[in-house]
Amino acid sequence: MKNEITLQTRREFLRRTVLTSALSWTVPTFLANTFSALQAEAMDRATQITTGKDSTILVVLQMAGGNDGINTVIPHGSDYYYKARPRIGIKADQVLKINDQVGLNPGLKSFKELYDQGNLAIVQGVGYPNPNRSHFRSTEIWQTASDSEAFEKYGWIGRYFDNACSGCDPTVGVNIGRQMPQAFAAKVPKGVSVDNPQNYRFINSENGQEGQMMEQSFRELNEQDNSGGSISAINGPSQLQNQRKGSVMDFLERTALDAQVSSDEIRAISARVESKATYPGSQLGNSLKLVAKLIGGGLPTRIFYVSQGGYDTHTNQVGTHQRLLADLGDSVKAFTDDLKAQGNMQRVLLMTFSEFGRRVSDNANAGTDHGAAAPMFVVGPRVKAGLLGQYPSLAPADLFQGDIKYTVDFRSVYASVLESWLHTRSEPILGRRFQPLPIV
């Protein structure tokens, strides 16, 4: 009787989880009834993914807050730049010059080194039509690859998973952070979120604390019952297949087991693999260090997602911005050094983005306000290094409401990465054709 009550309690928990979920789930057939069977299957999938022809890895790095692209890739050859920014303009003799017109912020010494090595492409003037200056909405546009007037339920990475990753390992996408980005939202949820190897979270959770509780609950649900059998074995295999095949219970049980396997694997890899480079002690440095460990440990992930905050520089920008960019450059350089020492550098491409740039003119508080277009950085030994696209004009007559006009649609960058790096068609993911750029 006690066992029946326990089972009923467990079933009720799972039903409530389904009813309160905000996601639409497509329920697959239950394929594994025990932890060991799933683990073997996961290892088989991992081998197929990591040894296949599409074993490239993408790392998406969000520069959250709205990076000032004009003080990142600096048009030091433009008089308009210095006239518009009397308080925060970077002196020409401090700029890390790429040519006689543009150069990098002095905080980006590591990026200049990557550029000189042929491992950095700079896509200039990236944005989209009818730009939105809201942090929330513009981030949503970038993460869902939508038009500024349209609202998409699923993220561009999630749509990639839906279109190209049927049957993939649960760790096909890994976010390093406390909350899953909307970019991962998918019809069939895939991917995991972790802010450190001991603090694993489900992609389905709205917040980190709930995610930890869900993991603990799922672990308890899949422990041995007092009767000596696991939940999936209580009714016997044939009865389970006949009565529960394709049910929501099946999917949740599979989700729990998948999560248990992947979380244990992430923890094990993190403990086993040693870093081969010295990283900054920042949040970004630690995030990229973990990503490098997971790559070195053979986790079958196609897309990693990391974030660096602090770019909403409305006041006293110069020092803060330079420190952020130094952290960015040094963290990414350490990451590339680590991957090179592992022998994995050829497999990895890193791409940065920020939800918008900043206004051309500085403000009275020695900062900048929300703007529009900004550059993107693409890092890796297989990039076509150099400057891509056209730097937007800073001439007052060429501005739109005080902002530079975009010259490259960000979805063209996504299309380039999807087609040339992840080897999949971009139209089903982006909704229509965007002309790829010669990035890789």
Model-derived segments and spans:
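Conserved H-loop
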Residues: 345
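Acidic/histidine-rich, metal-coordinating catalytic segments
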Residues: 348-356
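Histidine/acidic-residue-rich catalytic or RNA/ligand-binding cores of hydrolases
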Residues: 364-366, 371
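Feature for exported/extracytoplasmic and membrane-associated proteins, marking the mature portion
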Residues: 2-342, 361, 375-440
